[in-house]
């Protein structure tokens, strides 16, 4: 590891530790409906609290565009953080200035304070030097535990690391270690599964992966675009016909790099997209003109699972079919269960991420069996695309 972690933080009793966390959680009727992101950062907060630090939490919530917006106040999140930490969490009505400074001054060692939404100030997203200085005035040490915001060069995710001694929190550390195993320095063969609806949202990802993995499984609606580019009639299936040349270029790049491309050989088709819709399995070259492919078929599942069996490392982003609606979840569930079984047996390093992917693995009831499941969304995708992550790079540069 080329960055400092909490293992390097000793003798911090009484020190003001600014901790960047991800509290951008879903809220309905004033209640947090999914506490996963809070649970992920809880170990870092607890550890710093137990070491006697004055723990000061920095976070954003929503997109208030640099102005205070009542509905986007972090005050509504404080009680959910309290519940998960099982300790009092104080709240300050601003993240800089007197309100923040006074609240921090009143903290006892080991206590936790949540500052107001950093995005209530325009300087946050601009990474403005005056705003960074104002944030830094409230801390002695900076800990970044928000990998999910690491692809943004904002004041609280990147700027602060230039002003204070900077460390990776436990979530950041776990994420980076898992990603290093996934694509940084993986055990081979490496197989990637990329699914989801559209090729257009994952062009950079596919172009990067074909240079790094031994086999690329393409599923979901995006597989139709590749099949159509090869002359297959995909009927009424979701398909970006205008990206045929892009698909061909990715296939050519894969061939040149020695990366096997695994496309469906059969599909589960239906005339309507609803639960329990009449459906049939057809050869991929015999899709009825009035039907749409909503999942890959049993022969394709067999081929995908064979690749998973050969793999030492699996990187997964996106479902293989319309998993939200039965019976079009079969391929995703079958592949997920097979990958989970090999991971449990110690034969596979499995790293997965992206919103739909997490939901799909939870649906298959195997998320806990994967080596690592990232909740980071955009940052996970940009890492898979081979793009720099400012919030990570600055931790490496500083140490």
Swiss-Prot record:
Tell me which residues bind ATP. Answer: 202, 324, 354-357
SUPFAM superfamilies, A to Z: Phosphoglycerate kinase
Q: Which UniProt keywords apply?
A: ATP-binding, Cytoplasm, Glycolysis, Kinase, Nucleotide-binding, Transferase
Q: What is its EC class?
A: transferase
Task: Detail which positions bind substrate.
Answer: 22-24, 37, 60-63, 119, 152
- Pathway listed: Carbohydrate degradation; glycolysis; pyruvate from D-glyceraldehyde 3-phosphate: step 2/5
| Gene Ontology biological process terms from the UniProt entry | gluconeogenesis; glycolytic process
Catalytic activity annotation: (2R)-3-phosphoglycerate + ATP = (2R)-3-phospho-glyceroyl phosphate + ADP
What are its E.C. numbers?
Answer: 2.7.2.3
Q: Does the keyword Transferase apply?
A: yes
Give the GO molecular function terms.
Answer: ADP binding; ATP binding; phosphoglycerate kinase activity
Cell compartment(s), UniProt? Cytoplasm
Sorted alphabetically, which InterPro entries does this protein's record hold? Answer: Phosphoglycerate_kinase, Phosphoglycerate_kinase_CS, Phosphoglycerate_kinase_N, Phosphoglycerate_kinase_sf
Main subcellular location of this protein, as a coarse class: cytoplasm
| GO cellular component terms, A-Z | cytosol
This protein's assembly is summarised as:
Monomer.
User: Which family does the entry's similarity section mention?
Assistant: Belongs to the phosphoglycerate kinase family.
HAMAP family from the entry? Phosphoglyc_kinase
Q: What is this protein called?
A: Phosphoglycerate kinase
- Organism source for this protein? Rhizobium meliloti (strain 1021)
Taxonomic path: Bacteria, Pseudomonadati, Pseudomonadota, Alphaproteobacteria, Hyphomicrobiales
